[in-house]
Design a protein with these regions (language model features):
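Short gly/ser/thr-rich secondary-structure transition/capping motifs
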Residues: 23-27, 48-52, 75
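Switch II (G3) loop of P-loop NTPases
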Residues: 36-54, 72
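Conserved G1/Walker A P-loop phosphate-binding module
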Residues: 1-43
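Canonical P-loop GTPase G-domain recognition
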Residues: 102-140
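Conserved nucleotide-binding/hydrolysis micro-motifs of P-loop NTPases
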Residues: 45-47, 74-76, 99-102, 127-130
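Conserved beta-strand/loop subsegment of P-loop NTPase cores
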Residues: 65-71, 88-100, 115-125
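Inter-motif core of Ras-like GTPase G domains
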Residues: 51-75, 82-93
Length: 140
């Protein structure tokens, strides 16, 4: 299985997505540091939200085969700048989370990740297990 690093803002669903991918119970816990278990690298949202720790994400991304930009389907904004994906020297995919939420805007999330340069976009719901198998198949 390919190693993947998940990047996104706090509360975007990175940790919950990893729990769903592993088949674990969904239990909220705040990620405080870069957590590498199995083939999944979980990152604190604060690393992506601020300027100070972005370099750490870049360094850790070299340990992964794939970079996953995680964007919540209910977000009113996107922390990733347009055309940021080509900076990585590995595939960058977009992962839209919380697609089961009533106020989810899948088209807007897809457009934002396409503007980032993501070559493939997955739509997921960790609660409903939507898109989990598709993402696992991609990573296999």
């Amino acid at each position: 299985m390919k190693k993947i690093i998940f990047m996104g803002r706090s509360g975007s669903g990175k940790t919950t997505l990893i729990e769903a991918l592993k088949g674990e119970d969904l239990v909220y816990r705040k990620t405080q540091y870069i957590d590498y278990s199995d083939n999944f690298m979980d990152t604190p949202g604060e690393y992506a939200e601020g300027n100070d720790l972005g370099g750490a994400l870049a360094v850790y991304s070299y340990e992964a085969d794939v970079v996953g930009l995680v964007l919540c389907a209910t977000d009113d904004f996107c922390i990733f700048p347009p055309a940021c994906a080509p900076v990585a020297n590995r595939p960058v995919i977009g992962i839209v989370t919380k697609c089961d939420e009533p106020d989810a805007n899948l088209e807007l999330a897809k457009m934002r990740l396409e503007l980032c340069g993501c070559h493939r976009i997955f739509f997921t719901s960790s609660k409903e297990k939507q898109g989990i198998e598709e993402l696992l198949t991609y990573l296999a």
